[in-house]
């Protein structure tokens, strides 16, 4: 819970990101928080903050000006802070159909003022949604992005991002499918303490796609594709054999009933495996009913996905009347990634063994019928149900300032557990104006 009396409200002006960029913010081993964002004039930035010491100087660097000519949030940077301290920022040129992914690497550890020259990767189609992580088991950097709207491709680097493998197509959807892919790096307990896996969920566009099912799987650190229970499939990210993800081999998190659809909202970065989503009905493709979307969290238990009880209603769509598909976006959900109540200890099925240790927290942005709010919800029954913990931010509805996209930085702690966006929302159609907001509880 955030101590609102002690915490200080901080902001990054004119800052935005996208729902499908990863990682958007990372806490480095130096304790600093690094946030990637795009401005409403199309600039690509990385912000460095110290959430521990209020007297520490924050820094901000612009990596590219007028990227793609206008404020397309698809092009926001994904950032990766390597164990070496070097930082990689990757971003795209979505709106103009550019076939390049751009990236820059710091020349000095933890020093955003030393980003080297911009480098490029070329693809066979327009790019968007850069998702970048370090695979510490293989000593590699993994990079995912969507290409030509219907393909997801993977590259890896063995030298900290200096050179890259050829792209591997691992997910394809037919025209109109527009599949979305959301992946999180997870640390596992192992004898050497370095085991990792990459947990993902995929689904189709809520309005355009004909497939309204959320599915899940895992990439092991050796590239092997696993079902959610750990059962290997015959696909490996490293193998140049033409094999791709077979949707029928993945586990179904949520299958929309006839006449309904769903939004994938978050994928948990810690055990137990959890996926956040909101099903709803679109009575008219361009006038979705804001009373119907409801937030849920599904937990993987006993070899299957089990949805929670309804958590709360979303209350509104962010861009009603926009005809590019973004009218079906909601305020959003984010799983907490930190210490204590985040549930970093091994998940236990024993209901009598210290149940409070395994609580998990979700941050939710929504319209409560009167005001736009950012709230936290807690589960103490292993994700079966959630209760309201705290109203973190409240904006009167008549101000027409929306709250959306809560984000928990990778490796976040209680000093800065979450940040969110406030302003006007029109997604990638341009014309949005928003700021990043956060409460920070400094140690000194």
Identify the residue ranges that each predicted region occupies.
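Extracellular, repeat-based ectodomains that mediate carbohydrate processing or recognition
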Residues: 1-444
